[in-house]
Amino acid sequence: MNLTKVWNTTLGSLQVQLPRHEYNTWVRGATLLEIDNGVAIVRAPNAFIKEGLESRYLATLREQLGSVVGFPVDVRVVLASPDFERFDGAPHNGRSTENETRRTAQSLPLQPGSSSNGVNHPLERTPPQQLELHRAVRSSMLNPRYTFDRFIIGPSNRLANAACMAVAEHPAQAYNPLFLYGGVGLGKTHLLHAIGNFVLDRDPEVNVLYVSSETFTNDLINSIRRQQTEEFRIRYRNIDILLIDDIQFIAGKEQTQEEFFHTFNTLHSAGKQIVISSDRSPKAILTLEERLRSRFEWGLIVDVQMPDLETRTAILRAKAEQSPVPVPQPVIDFLAQRIQSHIRELEGCLNRVTAFAQMYNVPVTIEVATAALSELLDTNRRKRVTPDAILREVAAFYSVDLRALQGRSRSRNIVIPRQVAMYLLREETDSSLMEIGQLLGGRDHTTVMYGCEKITEELNSDARLRQEVATIRERLLHSAG
């Protein structure tokens, strides 16, 4: 059994299934060490992750691993040890743990410096603070893979990328605060990390803190419980750049909003940069205090939108270049057409497809992709459009009469659009072959099956047809949305 392939397939499923912040926080850094006598040994990078996996995700891990290996497994989580090496193919962030810890630790002061005038100095860390350091590293972690160079730019995110680059090049001079908002998995977190990585690459002495609003809230609660609120304020206010993710979660939390209000004021008045992300605009966060809302609107507010087909294709192509197995362009086009949501799901699906192909030692094809993603596609497809909408859109795209499309004509200018309609009706609706045949002039199910198979085969080799089908799908999605 190839543990690398098993774990990569499991991670692909979990990346699609779990919210982004949960996957990145709890699952991404874990590794599979062995499966023996029905027990899977999963290694956690630290005690915090180990506790979280055991308390929250054991059932999910059992289910997903069992689904991949084909038999029930129990899961035991162990703590990382120097005696073990990360196995080949495990997800990693491209840098050694030592370098990563150095980089992230230096971005967050843990103790007050010798100066009280707001100037940041490197702060000394002592062994008794080791547990505190681990917690700080987690909350300030910058993923070195998330850089501007690796961010795929399209019409949906061009302004957001430009604004973040301006902030990274001239902190607290361009837009302060910068507020990014948009749905999950659209690249907001990538851009926040990219700002931090860009700044630290230019000047490692800059104090950069990336943190989620949930972590901010938990740190505040813990500091109150331990009577360490002053240490909390030093930690969050003695920095140069604050990158705070998912700010919408502080809405309705009165004490958290109070503390963040004063943190914001302290940083802003000291000329420090603040970058905020949210799943909605400040005005749409209903239980957000007005004084915070008004401050969020001081700078620039940028909407990050859903990626279009061209951007989805570019994202998948860039991801495929890092794949251990070749991913042909027809498969990239297929995934870009079928996964019409967010970037996280796109990447998770590609990971699952390539791991599936590795596990069964087969090349990546559209058929393999369909098999690997069968559960996801069955869940997501057939729910956006109606058969009538498909017929109308196909007729309009090919400039043919709808009655001719549904009639008995066998002329070539009708046959190809009709076969495309058969294919889309089969792929995008719950219609049976017989029902599709009735919609298209009373044809029998074997004729419909032939038409669907013919289009499926030609999509592998005909770039023009792929583009035509993709365009029709885009129009259907927009009209249904």
Swiss-Prot record:
Name this polypeptide is given: Chromosomal replication initiator protein DnaA
Main localization, broad class: cytoplasm
**Gene symbol of the encoding locus:** dnaA
Q: What does the entry note on its domains? A: Domain I is involved in oligomerization and binding regulators, domain II is flexibile and of varying length in different bacteria, domain III forms the AAA+ region, while domain IV binds dsDNA.
Q: Which SMART domains match?
A: AAA, Bac_DnaA_C
Q: Where is the composition biased (Polar residues)?
A: 104-119
What task does this protein carry out? Plays an essential role in the initiation and regulation of chromosomal replication. ATP-DnaA binds to the origin of replication (oriC) to initiate formation of the DNA replication initiation complex once per cell cycle. Binds the DnaA box (a 9 base pair repeat at the origin) and separates the double-stranded (ds)DNA. Forms a right-handed helical filament on oriC DNA; dsDNA binds to the exterior of the filament while single-stranded (ss)DNA is stabiized in the filament's interior.
Q: Which GO terms describe its biological process?
A: DNA replication initiation; regulation of DNA replication
Q: Where is this region: Domain I, interacts with DnaA modulators?
A: 1-71
Q: Which InterPro entries match?
A: AAA+_ATPase, Chromosome_initiator_DnaA, Chromosome_initiator_DnaA-like, Chromosome_initiator_DnaA_CS, DnaA_C, DnaA_dom, DnaA_N_dom, DnaA_N_sf
Checking PANTHER family in the record gives: CHROMOSOMAL REPLICATION INITIATOR PROTEIN DNAA
Q: Which PROSITE patterns match?
A: DNAA
Show the segment(s) annotated as Disordered.
87-128
- List the Gene Ontology MF annotations in alphabetical order: ATP binding; ATP hydrolysis activity; DNA replication origin binding; lipid binding
Q: Which Pfam families match?
A: Bac_DnaA (PF00308), Bac_DnaA_C (PF08299), DnaA_N (PF11638)
